[in-house]
Amino acid sequence: MRNWRWLLLVLAALLAWLQHRFWFGPGNSGEVRMLQVQIVQQHQENERLRQRNASLAAEVKNLKDGDAAIEERARSELGMIKPGEIFYRVVEDIPAPLPNDTSADHGVDLSQPRREKR
């Protein structure tokens, strides 16, 4: 009977040591959870970069194969035009405020009749 008590005591001590190592030792459960979160974040970043690489590869292929993409970039980014073309720039006017627009009257209440000073 006495041997069983010693065996139980040794097993309890072993269990306590294993639990301590599981919760507080190197590679503990908190660290494992943190690493799992980092893995998920890294997978998301990798997927984002794969999509970006595919987009850039398609753009490079388009620039190598097609003149339309080169022309579009030259027109939009560099402001280039073809020989013989006439460049027109359309500048839109700022719309005048409407009479009932209270945002432009600078605090003047238009709903009240105006009283003139004499």
Curated annotation (Swiss-Prot):
It is found in: Cell inner membrane. One of its GO terms (cellular component) is cell division site. Residues 25-118 are periplasmic. Residues 1-6 are cytoplasmic. Residues 103-118 have a biased composition (Basic and acidic residues). Signal peptide: none annotated. Residues 98-118 are annotated as: Disordered. Residues 30-66 form a coiled coil. It holds the Pfam family DivIC. Keywords: Cell cycle, Cell division, Cell inner membrane, Cell membrane, Coiled coil, Membrane, Transmembrane, Transmembrane helix. The keyword Cell division applies. GO terms for biological process: FtsZ-dependent cytokinesis. The chain crosses the membrane at residues 7-24. The keyword Cell membrane applies. It comes from the Bacteria. InterPro entries: Cell_div_FtsB (IPR023081), FtsL/DivIC (IPR007060). It is a single-pass type II membrane protein. Essential cell division protein. May link together the upstream cell division proteins, which are predominantly cytoplasmic, with the downstream cell division proteins, which are predominantly periplasmic. Belongs to the FtsB family. NCBIfam families: PRK00888.1 (NF002058). Part of a complex composed of FtsB, FtsL and FtsQ. This is Cell division protein FtsB. It comes from Xylella fastidiosa (strain M12).
